[in-house]
A protein has these predicted regions:
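Exposed acidic/Ser/Thr-rich ligand/metal-binding surfaces
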Residues: 93-97
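Active-site-adjacent mobile loop/cap segments within catalytic or ligand-binding domains
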Residues: 38, 48, 99-196
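Catalytic-core regions of hydrolytic enzymes
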Residues: 1-92, 104-116, 192-195
């Protein structure tokens, strides 16, 4: 959080500041409330086999985005400013569906680029569990119009990686890698920078 706060034009907002549960939908709601331009969910993975290791990145799948778009449209049809300032309630359903689909397509594409940039940076610190950004229907990634990634820094179920995750120096390296990946994506695709 300190690294991001030191960057001009960037601000980090935590979804929680203590060890308490915040629902996945609650995390997305926080991102919407603060008008987040990006959502980066950072975790440690776990598996039944202790030899599994590596960092991973996830973005929303197209199937998940379509499902989220339908839920979003139903829940937010009376709100404006969620898609380019267009009040969805004032346009016909076909136009609304096209707007939501266009936003979903752009959001997923940006998220995939962001995930790839972050994984490229994490690769220098930890081996990758998979060589590319994977896609799945994680609820925390379903914030309509907010490019989102889920980063699995390592496997806490792997004793070696667990020790690394406890190390403050390693934590700093992970944080710096994630920030550098974010900055590289922002430089490569200035859409979010231009939105202010």
């Amino acid at each position: 959080m300190k690294l991001i706060g030191a960057e001009p034009g960037m601000k980090a907002v935590m979804t929680r500041n203590s060890d308490h549960f915040v629902s996945l939908g609650g995390r997305v709601a926080i991102a919407r409330r603060v008008k987040a331009h990006l959502l980066v969910s950072i975790h440690a993975d776990a598996w039944v086999k202790s030899n599994v290791r590596g960092s991973s990145g996830f973005a929303l799948s197209q199937k998940g985005a379509t499902s989220a778009a339908a839920r979003w449209l139903a829940k937010n049809q009376n709100e404006s400013d969620l898609i380019g300032g267009v009040n969805i309630a004032t346009v016909n359903k076909q136009v609304a569906t096209v707007l939501v689909d266009m936003t979903s397509t752009w959001t997923i594409g940006y998220s995939l680029g962001l995930g790839a940039a972050v994984l490229d940076e994490l690769r220098s610190i930890n081996r990758l569990h998979k060589g590319k950004v994977e896609q799945a229907g994680f609820a925390v990634l379903k914030g309509q119009g907010i490019p989102s990634i889920l980063v699995e820094t390592a496997f806490i179920s792997n004793p070696t990686e667990e020790q690394l995750l406890k190390n403050a120096n390693h934590q700093q390296k992970l944080a710096q890698a994630i920030l550098t990946g974010i900055k590289k994506q922002l430089a490569a695709d200035k859409t979010l920078v231009e939105q202010g």
